[in-house]
Amino acid sequence: MTGPLFVFVHGWGFSPGFWDAVRDALPDGESVAVDLGFYGPPSLPHIPAGRPPAGRSVVAVGHSFGALWLLHERPFAWDGLVLVNGFPRFTEGDGFAPATPRRVLDRMIARFDAAPQTVTADFLRRCGCEAPPPDGLEPARLGEALRALRDWDARDALTGPALALAGAQDPIVPPAMTEQALSGFDTAWHPEGEHLLPLTAPGWCAERIAAFAAGLTK
């Protein structure tokens, strides 16, 4: 049997290296990481079309906006989806509540054109990341993704096997938002976890991602 293929997608303001510790902690399988191009050219690793080889599952793993991007864009087929601090929609509206008020994103977008570095750094700090954004910030792609974060609604795309990994102390995606957005799907809660579980609890994430993947082939 061939081990699973894990495809990781980072969130808004981050880069593929965000996943390094989780990928290193996975006990089995192969992993690749999508680059949404926030600090350089975007890159989507080649994912074989059609069904995977017998016994091999494809598991998509998205953090925060990365989970929304996967659901909205569907860039490849997967057998299971893991949403880490993730959601199928970010802003309130159309019966989706509690969630982030749309005006919060409106303010970020209004400021972004004039001060992309500042807006990005402020958001990263709110997430719990004190390090400044890396060099090479790409305002056009970050700005487009910020508008997507405000406008996209991928609830109808959330079908099939899925697992949520959530932080009970997440200031960006609070527990009440996770519970209503992902009701009906298995959710693993990290009691001290905030919004950056792949950085603060990589082993915890890897263990649960691997167990979810193993369950897909049973």
Locate predicted features.
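Conserved HGGG/HGGXW glycine-rich cap/lid loop of the alpha/beta-hydrolase fold
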Residues: 2-43
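Gly/Ala-rich beta-loop-alpha elbow adjacent to hydrolase catalytic centers
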Residues: 61-66, 70
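Flexible "cap/lid" loop of the alpha/beta hydrolase fold
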Residues: 75-111, 144-154
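Conserved alpha/beta-hydrolase catalytic His-Asp/Glu region
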Residues: 111-156
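Short beta-strand/loop motif that positions the catalytic acidic residue
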Residues: 158, 164-166, 170
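Short alpha-helix in the alpha/beta-hydrolase fold that links the catalytic acid
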Residues: 160, 174-183
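Acidic catalytic loop of the alpha/beta-hydrolase fold
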Residues: 168-173, 195-196
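Catalytic histidine-centered segment of alpha/beta-hydrolase-like enzymes
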Residues: 193-206
